């Protein structure tokens, strides 16, 4: 049986509210966002900084209920600045024959990290460059 690593879910365009160098590592996310993104505490996540272009892997920890904080902790705090927009992505292993039917979940948040929309990932990129034809 062959497995493929596939995107499970992502929190799209979250705003970093804090960077704490003195904490042991991780990214702090509200329990509400973790739940809708199907990310468990201590689960590995990739963080892609839209603002700075940096990428790193860490693990999620649960923040305070009702909080809108996104706090990058430990050494990774060097890679973000409060106000940066990030994508927080989780992955799963799926049997190859099940990959075609797989639909990752995208959690959209507003500028204050409040839930805006949840939907399956849509395949396809809209080009911003006009077709020269």
Swiss-Prot record:
Substrate binds at residues 58, 74-76. It catalyses: L-aspartate + H(+) = beta-alanine + CO2. Is synthesized initially as an inactive proenzyme, which is activated by self-cleavage at a specific serine bond to produce a beta-subunit with a hydroxyl group at its C-terminus and an alpha-subunit with a pyruvoyl group at its N-terminus. Belongs to the PanD family. This is Aspartate 1-decarboxylase. GO terms for molecular function: aspartate 1-decarboxylase activity. It is an enzyme of class 4 (lyase). It comes from Legionella pneumophila subsp. pneumophila (strain Philadelphia 1 / ATCC 33152 / DSM 7513). Pfam families: Asp_decarbox (PF02261). Signal peptide: none annotated. Pathway: Cofactor biosynthesis; (R)-pantothenate biosynthesis; beta-alanine from L-aspartate: step 1/1. The gene is panD. Keywords: Autocatalytic cleavage, Cytoplasm, Decarboxylase, Lyase, Pantothenate biosynthesis, Pyruvate, Schiff base, Zymogen. Catalyzes the pyruvoyl-dependent decarboxylation of aspartate to produce beta-alanine. Its EC number is 4.1.1.11. PANTHER family: ASPARTATE 1-DECARBOXYLASE. Binds 1 pyruvoyl group covalently per subunit. One of its GO terms (cellular component) is cytosol. Its cofactor is pyruvate. The modification Pyruvic acid (Ser) is found at residue 26. It is found in: Cytoplasm. One of its GO terms (biological process) is alanine biosynthetic process.
């Amino acid at each position: 049986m062959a497995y493929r690593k596939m995107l499970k879910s992502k929190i799209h365009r979250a705003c970093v509210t804090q960077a704490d160098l003195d904490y042991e590592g991780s990214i702090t996310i509200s329990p509400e966002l973790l739940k809708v993104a199907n990310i468990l505490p201590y689960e590995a996540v990739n963080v892609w900084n839209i603002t700075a272009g940096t990428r790193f892997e860490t693990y999620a920890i649960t923040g305070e209920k009702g909080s809108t904080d996104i706090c990058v902790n430990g050494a990774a705090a060097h890679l973000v600045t409060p106000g940066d927009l990030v994508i927080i992505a989780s992955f799963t292993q799926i049997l190859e024959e099940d990959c075609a039917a797989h639909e990752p979940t995208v959690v959209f948040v507003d500028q204050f990290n409040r839930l805006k929309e949840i939907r399956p990932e849509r395949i396809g990129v809209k080009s911003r460059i006009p077709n020269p034809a």
